[in-house]
Amino acid sequence: MKILILSCNTGEGHNSCAKALQIAMQRRGINCEIQDTLALVSEGLSQRVGDAYLFSTRGSLFEFVYKFGGFVSSNMDTWQSLVYGANRLYAKKLFDYIKKHHFDIIVCVHLFPAEAITALKRNMQLDIPSYFIMTDYTCIPFLQETDLDYYIIPHEHLIEEFAEKGLPREKIVPIGIPIDEKKFSTRLPKPKARTQIIQTISNSNLCSEGNWYLVMSGSMGFGNVEQLIAQLLQDIRPEDTIICVCGRNESLLHSLQGQFAEQHQLCLIGFTNQVSILMDAADVVFTKPGGITSTEAIVKNIPLIHTHPIPGLENHNAHFFHHHGMSYFTTDVQHQVAIAKRLCEDTHYRKRMLHNQCANANPHSSDDVINLILENTPQPTNY
């Protein structure tokens, strides 16, 4: 059996989901490959789409595009969207790639390849099993115009939303978002995790005592990070520590270094692969409400505060988590810091949030996705 996971270069979340699934598959001896779908056309196209996505998330542009897409999507009848039409353009190249490498199963973690696979099923008789994994806690615009075999969604309480948007109920499977189980379903003891972080980060004045506040702005570095850090520095105790992960946003990193150069309670980090250990070391996590990072946090079972979302999908994520008691969501930085301090000081309040996280998280989501695939796998297709 050979599985192709199709992602897209729009933020790190989709790729993280794909990598987590690949790790779980390889652990079980399954031949699996991840492909940036648009890179099949050209690396330049993939880069341009990634840059366009990054630009669109600034200000209110993404919110407008998302709402407009939702309006168009909800008013479609028999005609297909421009999104479908655009992804049909490279579908033949994708078909040739699938045929050349003899893949038996397709898993899409992004809408674009799901649209392309739909076109191949309709126009080129692609007849191998196909799966879609939703990496946010809501149904995205245009998903209902795709035609894959199964749609794996983050939570059972979202079934009605996806069905109401037009997805066949029998195809909806509420397993959860795949995460790296080995990293996030286990925890290092806090002192050991802090020791590792202190040893890893050079030129830092990290103190192993006190409360550690972990501020994460996503792989691209979003959110009102400057205001949050300023408020934390004003309100926390002298023995407490702030660790801020700026992702790949170098301008944010340099700006914070300039603004807070004399603040020894603050440690600034760029892009890192040590998120799991940072969560082990922290007492509270502040993060924008991306679907992947939020899922990793509740599987890790750490107090979680959702900060400024990218308008659109992340608003839905934040409200879903807040409604289920898995996080606290507010865009007011004073309130964010006040809640963070309460989570550190109020044992009952903290335990209630952690209990809600355990009740709603699936640490075995990657393996459960694989089990679903294996249960529904026919004999390999002969091209």
Q: Positions of the model-derived regions?
A:
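Active-site and donor-binding regions of nucleotide-sugar-utilizing enzymes
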Residues: 12, 17, 71-167, 171-175, ...
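Acidic donor-binding loop of glycosyltransferase active sites
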Residues: 280-290
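A short, well-ordered alpha-helix in the C-terminal region of glycosyltransferases
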Residues: 349-363
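Donor-nucleotide binding loops and adjacent catalytic segments primarily
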Residues: 204-281
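A nucleotide-sugar donor-handling region in carbohydrate enzymes
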Residues: 149-211, 217-219, 248-249
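Conserved N-terminal ligand/cofactor-binding loop architecture of enzyme catalytic domains
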Residues: 20-100
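C-terminal "capping" alpha-helix adjacent to the active site of nucleotide-linked donor transferases
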Residues: 323-325, 331-349
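C-terminal alpha-helical cap of glycosyltransferases
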Residues: 362-383
